Amino acid sequence: YEGKIFITQGFIGATENGVPTTMGRESSDFSAAVIGEAINASEIQIWTDVDGIFTADPRVISQAKYIAELTFEEALELADKGAKVLHPKTMLPAMERNIPIRIRNSKNKKSSGSLITSEIKQQNGAVSIAQKKDVILIRFSPFDKKNYPLLSEHISGLHAKYCISPLSQISDERGITFLFQHIPSVDFFIREISEIGQTEIQTNLSLISLVGRNILQ
């Protein structure tokens, strides 16, 4: 196939039975990453409407600057913490084969974009700030504080039942504090734990994350 250019669609896949279906949010980028992994590409390029990954959301912080290079781990952490340029699952196929990903702007071809790779020369410190909106905080204090192992198992079972995963979960002598992206299934989770303990809820929060290397040093 040398010298040939193949064009295919993203976002479309198939079930185990071969029935065509969509693959979910950001699956066009994911499709490119999977194909890149399959052919062991030298680079995977994702073309979008921004110059790359920025030090902050440029729609919120006008002084934000684009990042020329960052590691897979940093990009994965940023995506997980709310950065919109790449979905976390897009990075995984590239990481398996150590294939660099370059984010390019289809409206600004003069920009070389952001290169995501395994190793870069970088000083310690923050690389970028990510924001995840519509976060809910749940403070849960169980009525029966004597049997935490069973309580922990029950809570984990509810996470699995409603297909939710906390952004953060901290336990202390008073109970457990959860942070979740506020999706409808979280409300069912709250309803169930309210039957076995007292809950305090704060909504319309944002989770702000600093991503980088040895930030506290």
Roles of regions detected by a PLM:
Residues 1-217:
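C-terminal catalytic "cap/lid" subdomain
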